[in-house]
């Protein structure tokens, strides 16, 4: 027997010491994808058998305790054979604070009457592939009537587990199932709501019925929204839908941090009616809300662009950390932590949202007063901000570990690309907008870009500086990648700027160290000099490592910096970026890896969430595993408008049932392995809104490029012969 206490991590990062409202450790609630469930495993040895698809458990779409689906476990346990199945914990980036559990809880439903002894045995698998002891499920399922959901609660101490808490809970990797009595018969059971719960859960004497605010229809989906209630009392909201206004069926749940539901109907001209209830941890349900309804309708390309821009904008407006008004790293994820680079992108998305009428200018002004006030008080490191900040305190969060506890110059540059854009937008002569400009000017002039050279004669800028460990990370900034804007803003800095020559000595360096750096991460010699000159898929690429890299390289630095208007010794960057986008699409059309879905309307390899971690995909076989992020093609609209529009239509009309959500398209998907990310990412939602707006009106480009310091900096670089 193995005890979880033995797995306690001794050294905790500073981020785990923060105070944040805890949440539940959930192995399964619902699958976004039909077919097989990615975070599961199923295998057998004949004559036993377990139903599976590609060694995963099937998703049961028509049977569910928590709508809309459950997992199907159909098996034969025969003498001389064996089977095994597990339901894995799906890691959510930033979910690190959990209610201390005491039980493994689930809902179980038998399809038919069965021999209770043939129920599976159950254990918990550790991350190191060892197991707790197996228990007989029949000892905890007291009621075996078929066709009814039965709650099952197994004390963790029965598995030999004790002292489970935030320091070790992620060592619990999966719920494992093996045969009980081998009687040779076929049985089916359904499993739902598999989670670890504490002994004492929040409850209330009476739940208030939610108050619905709107139902808004689009081409193939309807959004409903309600007034949020106290999150402490509610486990989830349950959404009911009717097509006749009389008979309602539960179709989904939403955890209390989300007060919206996107119902993807997949049809045009479909009317639906909705009600919502609140459900507490004892599964008590409130009265119904009032009814709202809407009807889907055909949309033009321009209307689809509006729809996508607004949904992605919503991430930064409704999904923002409330005290700072800035962007979270991802949703779901760490509630109190803001990501500074994503916030800079979101600032530009909010400006676009004002111009598009998603919010009023006055609403935008109030948000920016909050943002600038927060940033003025937040931790700074020679004027630079950290990558992650606690939105409730303004203190640095060392989310990537104890070395990441100081200034992050790249994230600072992403933030200030947005702030300078906003500074130019809020140009009215009233007290509030004057205050916004004054605050941004003060923040801007106090960034000590030159400090991040590390030493006086350094040809490079450095990514990080720690107040107690100095240059411990010691990462030089060398292009080609996402950091062009860092060098550009450092040259533009009004008080602590760097020499414009550092554009060539640092960013575009041709020193041996820089050559080795590029060849190492690109795993090719192409582009190691910064310049390239090779032709890929019919496009001659003047600058770039390998055949261009992930597409965020042509997005992040150019949300405000207009690549049409920047030409250095080697290339014009609109033309060069456009070639990279075309190379990426043509690689996906050719599809050497044979990945499901790739083509002229499914392309755009870039950095995104993946099943177990964050990865950067690019158009090279060794950097491509079939994972596609919608932001890749959609943030490339200025470069490839026709190809990007094809991708938008495809993602929405053909894959919207799992890919489209409350904040636009989910971060990534992989049709080859039937996986979709549960996340919306702060770094990936805004570039879609911003670059579509730049394609349509040049708005953000015009604003950023109008700043006097930006104009001076570009002139300095372009004057170098």
UniProtKB/Swiss-Prot annotation:
Stretch forming the signal peptide: 1-18
Temperature-dependent activity: Optimum temperature is 40 degrees Celsius.
Span of domain Glycoamylase-like: 474-708
Catalytic EC class: hydrolase
pH dependence: Optimum pH is 6.0.
Reaction(s) catalysed by this chain's protein: [(1->2)-beta-D-glucosyl](n) + H2O = [(1->2)-beta-D-glucosyl](n-2) + sophorose
UniProt keyword Signal present: yes
GO molecular function: hydrolase activity, acting on glycosyl bonds
EC number, UniProt record: 3.2.1.214
Protein's cellular compartments: Periplasm
InterPro entries for the chain: Glycoamylase-like_cons_dom, Ig-like_fold
Record's GO cellular component terms: periplasmic space
Function: Catalyzes the hydrolysis of linear beta-1,2-glucan and beta-1,2-glucooligosaccharides with degrees of polymerization (DPs) greater than or equal to 4, to produce sophorose. The best substrates are tetra- and pentasaccharides. Acts as an exo-type enzyme that releases sophorose from the non-reducing end of the substrate. It cannot hydrolyze cyclic beta-1,2-glucans.
Subunit relationships: Monomer.
UniProt name for this protein: Exo beta-1,2-glucooligosaccharide sophorohydrolase (non-reducing end)
Gene source species: Parabacteroides distasonis (strain ATCC 8503 / DSM 20701 / CIP 104284 / JCM 5825 / NCTC 11152)
